[in-house]
Structure formats: C-alpha cells, structure tokens
Curated annotation (Swiss-Prot):
Pfam families in alphabetical order: Phycobilisome (PF00502)
Keywords from the named record: Antenna complex, Bile pigment, Chloroplast, Chromophore, Electron transport, Membrane, Methylation, Photosynthesis, Phycobilisome, Plastid, Thylakoid, Transport
Disulfide bonds: none
Gene Ontology CC annotation, any one: phycobilisome
Residues with the N4-methylasparagine modification: 72
PANTHER family in UniProt: C-PHYCOCYANIN BETA SUBUNIT, PHYCOBILISOME 32.1 KDA LINKER POLYPEPTIDE, PHYCOCYANIN-ASSOCIATED, ROD 2-RELATED
Protein name per the record: C-phycocyanin beta chain
Species annotation: Rhodella violacea
PTM characteristics: Contains two covalently linked bilin chromophores.
Bilayer topology term: Peripheral membrane protein
Xref: Gene3D superfamilies: Phycocyanins
Assembly description: Heterodimer of an alpha and a beta subunit, which further assembles into trimers and the trimers into hexamers. The basic functional unit of phycobiliproteins is a ring-shaped hexamer formed from two back-to-back trimers contacting via the alpha chain subunits. The trimers are composed of alpha/beta subunit heterodimers arranged around a three-fold axis of symmetry. The phycoerythrins also contain a gamma subunit which is located in the center of the hexamer.
Binding positions for (2R,3E)-phycocyanobilin 2 per the UniProt entry: 153
Protein localization: Plastid, Chloroplast thylakoid membrane
Length: 172
C-alpha cells in the first residue's frame, strides 16, 4: 500500500503538481479497501479456533468414518494433527487475504501438501471438504457487518472464498 502512495506522490512531484482529486480519490478508495481487508482478516484471526472447531464438527458429522476406529482422525494424536493442519491452512488463507495475493498460500502451505497427504494415507477429498467447511464458517464471520467496515464487501468475500477454494483444490 505504501508503494502505491509513494508512486502517486513521486509522479505528482516529478510534474511539480499537487495531488489531483482523482489521485486522492484513488488513494482514499485504497485505504477504505485496506480497512475492510484488515477488518475481515482480524475477524477470521479472532475466531480461528471456533472456525476450525465448527468446520471439524461439521466434517466429522458428515463423514463419521473419519473418527471411528481405523479412521484417519481416530485417536487423539490423529485428531490433533487434523485440527492443527486445518488451523495452518486457515492461517495461510488469512495471510493471502491480508496480502491480496495467493502466492504465500501457494508457496508456504499448498506446495507439496497433496503429496504429503497421499504419503500419509490421508484422504484428500476429506481434507478438501474440511477446507470448504472452514470457508463457510470464515466467510460468515468475516462478512458479519459488526466485524467489517461499512460498505460493499462482496468482492473481498469472493476473494477470500477463492483462497479456500484454491486450498481445497490443491489437496483434493
């Protein structure tokens, strides 16, 4: 964001002019979008535990074989690993959302994750379903009008949803 401000100021300075109303309006819109983004990510981060918990409950209600003897989330150790992985994916989705770019999610979280799950015998479709459940919970929290700066947040919510979709597709 500071780069955009610096660029606009440098351009005006090079021309020896004050910032124009169009430039100021553009910067103002960028700040408003940034505030919405900060609010949405703050809401997700503040509710991360409940997002992961509700997604896991929904997943295990839908796929009870995962928590039955022989299931991939059976035993406390495996359940803890499952919840940890869901939390890590949520954390990297929040990084992507604040940056407005999926590269941190791709590079540091998703790259090689499918192969890791395959090597461990973890069903990718179940992981993807869990990610989709997290998406539903996170979007509900982030889109709550008491958590986000007033204004249309549909594009931001669609962007955040796309990061979850990207994560689900990477492990499926």
């Amino acid at each position: 964001m500071l780069d955009a401000f610096a660029k606009v100021v440098a351009q005006a300075d090079a021309r020896g002019e004050f910032l124009s109303n169009v430039q100021l309006d553009g910067l103002s819109a960028m700040v408003a979008d940034g505030n919405k983004r900060l609010d949405a990510v703050n809401a997700i981060n503040s509710n991360a535990s409940s997002i992961v918990t509700s997604a896991a409950r929904a997943l295990f209600a839908e796929q009870p074989q995962l928590i039955q003897p022989g299931g991939n989330a059976y035993t406390n150790r495996r359940m803890a690993a499952c919840l940890r992985d869901m939390e890590i994916i949520l954390r990297y989705v929040s990084y992507a959302a604040i940056a407005g770019d999926s590269s941190v999610l791709d590079d540091r979280c998703l790259n090689g994750l499918k192969e890791t799950y395959q090597a461990l015998g973890t069903p990718g479709a179940s992981v993807a379903a869990g990610v989709q459940k997290m998406k539903e919970a996170a979007i509900a929290v982030a889109n709550d009008s008491s958590n986000v700066t007033v204004g249309d947040c549909s594009a931001l919510m669609a962007e955040i949803a796309s990061y979850f979709d990207r994560a689900a597709a990477a492990v499926a």
